[in-house]
Amino acid sequence: MYVDLLDRAEFGVFFEHFVFLELRAFLDYFEPRSEIGLWRTQKGEFEVDFVVGRRLGIEVKAAGRVTPRHLDGLRKLREEGIVAKLVVVSCEPHCRHLEEENIRIYPWRNFISELWSRRGWLWE
């Protein structure tokens, strides 16, 4: 029996792992001393999937449309002043920049492309 992975509840975990592997490969190749970690509030109410040094906070969402609720962890991270840029990697079809919050929403292909090219907003 064929089952489409996009229809599985586990797809979000697979998707987050895929983004992690790309980040880890990139950092190992270009910035071997850079650290990647998870950020979470003291009580665990909010978290951000990946924090790359003091440069980048990344939330990964397998959703086809990122909603305001998906941004809660990034908003809290911004309040802490830990990173310079905030990003959501998603399954959305187009890039968006939420200017009022200075958060970029990337389709995963665009994010991976910009990451490896070392050009674009991520690198400004």
Please describe what each predicted stretch is.
Residues M1-E124:
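A cross-kingdom feature that marks ATP-driven nucleic-acid transaction machinery
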